[in-house]
Amino acid sequence: MSDGHTMHILRAEMPGPTAGKLVSRMSDTAKILYGMYFVMTLVMIGLLLLGGMDLFDASVHAFGAAGTGGFSSRNASVGAYNSAYIDIVTGIGMLAFGINFNLYYFLLMRRFRDVAKSEELWAYLGIVAFSTVTIAANIHHLYGAVGTSLRHAFFQVSSIITTTGYATVDFDQWPGYAKTVLVLLMFVGGCAGSTGGGLKVTRVVTLVKAAFMDMRKMIHPNAVVNVRMEGRAMPEKQVRGVQAYFSVYMLLYAVSWLLLSLNGFDLLSTFTALSACINNIGPGLGMVGPTGNFSAFAPWAKLLLSFDMLAGRLEIFPMLLLFVPSTWRGNRLRRWERRN
């Protein structure tokens, strides 16, 4: 397959609004990314082994964090180990896999300036830091010790923003502020070019900047203003593409929420069940919290949530294109042309 065709596939499958090559050949770029993914996973397995996990559990939890899938071999998830060391290692591991993998390549190539000027990275780390500190303060009365509060807050923030879904405690029992922040983090997601789901940090930053740009244009109609990322003006087409994605995302969310409400469950459970699925988190709140599950949903609702999970993971558009008649007409025309 040519590099041109491969690039089109990359743009379709890449989590986030942008995709690019690290080196001249796409095949070499893929090897670099897969190599970093493999090495980081092995490092995490080794660190978990040092914490007392056996090889099977360490491998399961490392792969669950690496792919931000969140699968655990224990019913109580990572909380079953009741280990501060394992919590910290897993939390940092999840956070690392939520970062754009291109930045790790830049670090290896000593391109520190490219890493330092990444607005998405600083926004990501800033959101994590703010959320961790404020949630820790909000739940301090539940755990007493500052260190314990920070540990649980950091782990859950890292788990939710990277869309991994691991848990050390039943955060459904936390105060309202802490739960609200976690729900908001479900929508933010990881960085573009990471294994995380959600909207992606770069899209959120772009949407906020575009909103301020539009407000400035309303105040100063003749002013020439652009959305700037990392010191460069973003093409108008790219900004509108992010806004279009967000609009389709919210439309799918609204339709799915309306249909799920027919199950008759409480608002919180329905809302967070959909949020957890479309953003690929796993646990939500209420009946689908860390100690709950989705078994009470009707079969058709489970199919809908399954579709939302796939749509969210594939960046929505590829899934929705399946229902556009012209997609199939175009394929039939190309097959007819090849036969003739």
Residue locations for each model-derived region?
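Membrane-proximal intracellular helices of multi-pass ion channels
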Residues: M1-N340
